[in-house]
Amino acid sequence: MAMKIRLARGGSKKRPHYSIVASDSRMPRDGRFLEKLGTYNPLLAKDSEDRIKMNVERVQYWLSQGAQPTDRVARFLEAAGLKEKAVRNNPKAAVPGKRMAELAKKKAERAAASAE
């Protein structure tokens, strides 16, 4: 059974409220879960203590059992100091597109020609 620590959405339309839960990865997002580990309220200010609440002991237990946090929950765990900060590297996003690469090449050729 592949365990995930993830967010389960609650609240009403345009008023989201999330529960941090430990569940089987095959279950629906808001479906059955094994344990509620905390809450996340994105509507509160970022510096509010009530924005993210977690039961640290239970989160550590599930991590020791092999549960994998989702990306957003992993960021919460990094902020709480429960997990090492993952290096996020997307080198393909920094590579210019075809058109910009052609323009840069032409600009370099013009600069080389004017330097001669």
Curated annotation (Swiss-Prot):
<dbReference type="Pfam" id="PF00886">
    <property type="entry name" value="Ribosomal_S16"/>
</dbReference>
<dbReference type="GO" id="GO:0015935">
    <property type="term" value="C:small ribosomal subunit"/>
</dbReference>
<dbReference type="InterPro" id="IPR000307">
    <property type="entry name" value="Ribosomal_bS16"/>
</dbReference>
<feature type="region of interest" description="Disordered">
    <location>
        <begin position="88"/>
        <end position="116"/>
    </location>
</feature>
<dbReference type="GO" id="GO:0003735">
    <property type="term" value="F:structural constituent of ribosome"/>
</dbReference>
<feature type="compositionally biased region" description="Basic and acidic residues">
    <location>
        <begin position="99"/>
        <end position="110"/>
    </location>
</feature>
<keyword id="KW-0687">Ribonucleoprotein</keyword>
<dbReference type="GO" id="GO:0005737">
    <property type="term" value="C:cytoplasm"/>
</dbReference>
<dbReference type="GO" id="GO:0006412">
    <property type="term" value="P:translation"/>
</dbReference>
<keyword id="KW-0689">Ribosomal protein</keyword>
<dbReference type="InterPro" id="IPR023803">
    <property type="entry name" value="Ribosomal_bS16_dom_sf"/>
</dbReference>
<protein>
    <recommendedName>
        <fullName>Small ribosomal subunit protein bS16</fullName>
    </recommendedName>
</protein>
<comment type="similarity">
    <text>Belongs to the bacterial ribosomal protein bS16 family.</text>
</comment>
